Amino acid sequence: MENGKVKYLDTLIEQDDRENHVGCAGRVNSVEYDIYSSKNIEDMGEYKDLNGEVARLTDVIMKADKPFLIYGAKGIGKTSLVHHICRKNGISLVAFSCGIGTNKADLKGRLQVDKDGSYFERGILPTAFLVANESKHAVLYIDEIGALDHDVQKWLNRPLDDRHSCEAGGRKYTLNEGCKLAIVATTNPIEYAGVNNLTEDLRSRFIGQRWKNPTSTQLEEIVDWSDIPDASVKSPLLTLVEDIYALRQKADVEYILSPRDLIQFVQVYRDLGESSFSGDILEETISETILIKYTDPQEHELVKARCNETFGVSIA
């Protein structure tokens, strides 16, 4: 640090601290800490606290002594809440979105080659420890942890248990005294495509919450309904959400409508009303924001029939 500012090392640096080495170590990439600063966290808009989840997750993040898992459907604000808390409290955020192809190298790191030879590019786990030590307090946010294969999940065991460390590229990464790293993960319900159960040993490391889908009353709080007709648009839309959820419970459809879908609906409805669009605004909004989500032909026809009946429209 110089004059309170981060002085970046060269793009590649030599590992020192030989006592922490656990294997061969050489050049590694440097970390641009400003990327993870709370000042650079995206503003995802105001978060609506429905069930006291803001206070609970804030407490978990401030204590940073237990990994926390949020289990819930897509589009209900899991990511938004983590961003909101970190921005508000000046906490650095290291966010990582898991996918079907995420592997050990994404978590721990991988060897790369440049004109000077090989070097180790650190993955998200060692990066999180470095950011926490630099900023004194950071959150490692692992989005969609259930997308990880079981053999990849095991590499999270060590950072999430009482060892609070990881080994990568021949070096041990751990927290300095007085530094905190809160770990928050999210996952969608197991019935979603591409979602795996967490292994027992990984589950045993988490505490957490299971978030339910918002009720119609809560959806009225989340969505900005100003200038949206109640009888012809708002009420039928809320009814449709409940109907499609019932269809999902019977396994007739895979996709359920989330708050994100409703927000898209009212935004598109407004946009079309303010544009030069000459067709039926309600029917077009339904097609663009609801029916487009159902790619299976049988599900598409079923949901279209429900939309026609609920909204009193005639979408062909």
Residue spans for each PLM region:
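C-terminal regulatory/interaction module of P-loop NTP-utilizing enzymes
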Residues: 1-316
